[in-house]
């Protein structure tokens, strides 16, 4: 493919490439907010104590672009900074001029907030494909009291 066309209606290919890969799409707004994270013991959840989140990992497959927002309480950028981390699908050693790469892997985002006081949101306004597979978290669970 000759390159990425933003508002074009045609594309051209080089003579030596008989089967080019072409990405065509309409930009759309994607937003997914994860629910509150908690620890489960069997069929019950453990709601007592404090679950201090450290990292959040999102598994993706053949994805081109997305952003992850970590919004601690209060959820307003004027009162507390909203942390944003961007995934572009580009890795060192895999970049070629005029070629859009899709990547598969795990995207890690630092959180460092109590699980009850944070919103974790995945956003995308790109025409590139986005395929989220799963999400995991790393956290400390501190129980305040326990029956003996």
Regions found by a protein language model. Give the residues of each.
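Beta-sheet repeat architectures centered on beta-propellers
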Residues: 1-148
């Amino acid at each position: 493919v000759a390159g990425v066309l933003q508002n074009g209606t045609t594309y051209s290919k080089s003579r030596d490439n008989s089967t080019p890969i072409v990405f065509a799409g309409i930009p759309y707004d994607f937003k997914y907010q994860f629910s509150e994270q908690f620890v489960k013991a069997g069929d019950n959840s453990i709601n007592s104590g404090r679950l201090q989140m450290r990292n959040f990992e999102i598994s993706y497959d053949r994805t081109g672009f997305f952003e992850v927002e970590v919004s601690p309480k209060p959820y307003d950028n004027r009162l507390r900074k909203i942390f944003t981390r961007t995934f572009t699908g580009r890795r060192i050693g895999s970049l070629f001029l005029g070629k859009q790469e899709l990547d598969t892997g795990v995207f890690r985002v630092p959180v460092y907030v109590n699980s009850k006081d944070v919103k974790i949101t995945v956003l995308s306004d790109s025409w590139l494909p986005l395929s989220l597979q799963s999400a995991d978290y790393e956290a400390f669970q501190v129980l305040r009291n326990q029956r003996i």
